[in-house]
Amino acid sequence: MGDAEKGKKIFVQKCSQCHTVEKGGKHKTGPNLHGLFGRKTGQAEGFSYTDANKNKGIVWDEGTLLEYLENPKKYIPGTKMIFAGIKKKGERQDLIAYLKQSTSS
């Protein structure tokens, strides 16, 4: 899929202001992402989601994240995630490779 090392740099630049990935990491503006893969939208315990996120009902995996990260507001209209998205597919694949590695250990 992607390159996790490159993905880590993308995460630090574009995601870490609002998200953490480590087990037991705190929620920031966005939820902690540990355990993301295989979880339904809007399910990180202790984070206040919009109804749009809670009701989307998809399960996060490589495919859903690839689509979501391109344009979050288009994928989940009503999400409070203000990030515009990552247009380059390769960058999204690198980020997903990093997330897969960092959110499951």
Curated annotation (Swiss-Prot):
Heme c binds at C15, C18, H19, M81. It comes from the Eukaryota. It is found in: Mitochondrion intermembrane space. Binds 1 heme c group covalently per subunit. One of its GO terms (molecular function) is metal ion binding. The modification N-acetylglycine is found at G2. InterPro entries: Cyt_c-like_dom, Cyt_c-like_dom_sf, Cyt_c_1A/1B. Belongs to the cytochrome c family. This is Cytochrome c, testis-specific. The lineage of its organism: Eukaryota, Metazoa, Chordata, Craniata, Vertebrata.
